[in-house]
Amino acid sequence: MVIVYFILILTGVIMVHELGHYLFARLFKVKVLEFAIGFGPKIFSVKGRETTFRLNVFPIGGYVRMLGEEGEEIADEEEKEKSFYAKPAWQRFLITLAGPLFSILAGYLLFLPITLNWGIALPGIDEVVPGSPAEEAGLRRGDIIYSINDKIAFDTSIISNEIQKGLPVELVIIRNGEKKSLRLTPRMYPETYEFVLESAEGTPSGKLVSVNGNRDTSVLKEFVNEYVVLEFEGGTVKGILKQFNEIPARYMIGISFSGLAPVFKKDIYFKEGLFVFKKGDRIVRVEDQEIEGWQDLVVLYQRLTLGKDTMIVSLQGENIEWWRGLSGSVRVVIKRGDSTIEKNVEASFLKNILETPDLLEMGVPRYKPKNPLEAVNLSVKACNYVLLTTASSLKNFFRNVQTGQIVGVVGLAGVISAASKTGLEAVLTVVAVITISLGVLNLLPLPALDGGRIIFSLVEMITRKKLNPQVENIIHFLGFIFLMILFLYITFLDIGRMMGI
């Protein structure tokens, strides 16, 4: 079924894009020979008065083939007038621009019913650090951050970027359905050390005083995979340092954001006919750890990936948090209605639950606009954010190629598969993001892409000199070869990620 979803979505997205080219070509009386979805051999075709409409085997793109577009000679004068290169540069510019424009506009139109029906996801506050600027300003667990410095908080990165400036920020939060403004000033927090100790002995308490007798505790990172003795103000801890991560000092306000909620979305079966957890059950404790929200689930997952003799430690100045790993049978306390129930399950089984999509409820809150006007405003701003983020990601990719930032057709299939398990809203959102991204991607000034053809039209409009169509088509052909190689490379990376390579 996922494959069907994937093909339908990709076909629809491509069709909208190519429809832009087709309609503008017809508007300027350019003869369209073929309107094709996909590449390769045709599955079927329908012959119109002038145009053959084709559905091809590989749904990875599409094209509108116009008369004379490939630089071929046209003997008939009447037919020649209908050819692509017989039209002025400004008309060719608009025909080429129409594809990306239709893609982007389709994304904007799709976001409106999403916003009207489901609202928009906004960052929720999962934890407030005691004594932090957030607590002092009155922020509470469960508050929703609507905007920061007049920027709608479509993503937590928007909040983080504003906070990292270190300047006072203006927050608009939603509490009990009502908006409220708060002003607070970020505070510089010291660097954080996060590390894992194997064969750990002892209990840490207070500030870290020395590492293997050295009072310069920053040397800890030099002892990965070595035995260390850590002196704390309230005790000594020994073990093998297996992992170490240093987070630099940074401005913060003292909050963490919500993610998954510790509530089961469906019945969980240990084996056929024997359920362990029921839909609606809330995890409240696992062994010695209270579970209230997303951050607790993150720590729990870390503990479940480690053995009992392993310790996770997080140090920030004089603040310390530590947990021992969990293995074997673990005690899970759940709330089911008014009842509190204890269950013993294997750590590996609980870990598998946390790893499996769509078993736990989403804890990310949604804000539904009060009226259609606000819905239009929010949907337009959401699309603007997607547009700018896509453009920024492409710019960063070409400046500093990082293969983990990009996905191809196989990767998109995985994204659509995950969205289909979540619900219609997630699927429509993915479609809107894909179609906007397709529009932006096609505007890149690369041969074979619409952006490359737009550049040729602009140059002609400025210089009033037409490049030989055959030369232009050779350039686009070479660009197409490059894009196909890039496509195959990205597909290889997608498959590698799926196989864990």
UniProtKB/Swiss-Prot annotation:
**Binding positions for Zn(2+)?**
H17, H21
Gene Ontology MF annotations: metal ion binding; metalloendopeptidase activity
Is the keyword Cell wall biogenesis/degradation assigned to this protein? no
Segments spanning the bilayer are 93-115, 401-420, 427-449, 474-496
Kindly give the membrane topology term recorded for this protein.
Multi-pass membrane protein
* Cofactor entry: Zn(2+)
Protein name listed in UniProt: Putative zinc metalloprotease TM_0890
CDD domains found in the cross-reference section? cpPDZ_EcRseP-like, S2P-M50_PDZ_RseP-like
Instruction: Enumerate the active-site residues.
Output: E18
State a single Pfam family of this protein: Peptidase_M50
InterPro entries registered for this protein in UniProt:
PDZ, PDZ_6, PDZ_sf, Pept_M50_Zn, Peptidase_M50
The Gene Ontology CC terms held by the record are:
plasma membrane
Annotated PDZ domain residues: 96-180
Q: What is stated as this protein's family in its record? A: Belongs to the peptidase M50B family.
Q: Which GO terms describe its biological process?
A: proteolysis
Q: Which domain of life is it from?
A: Bacteria
Q: Where in the cell is it found?
A: Cell inner membrane
- State its Enzyme Commission number(s): 3.4.24.-
Keywords in alphabetical order: Cell inner membrane, Cell membrane, Hydrolase, Membrane, Metal-binding, Metalloprotease, Protease, Transmembrane, Transmembrane helix, Zinc
Q: Give yes or no: UniProt keyword Metal-binding.
A: yes
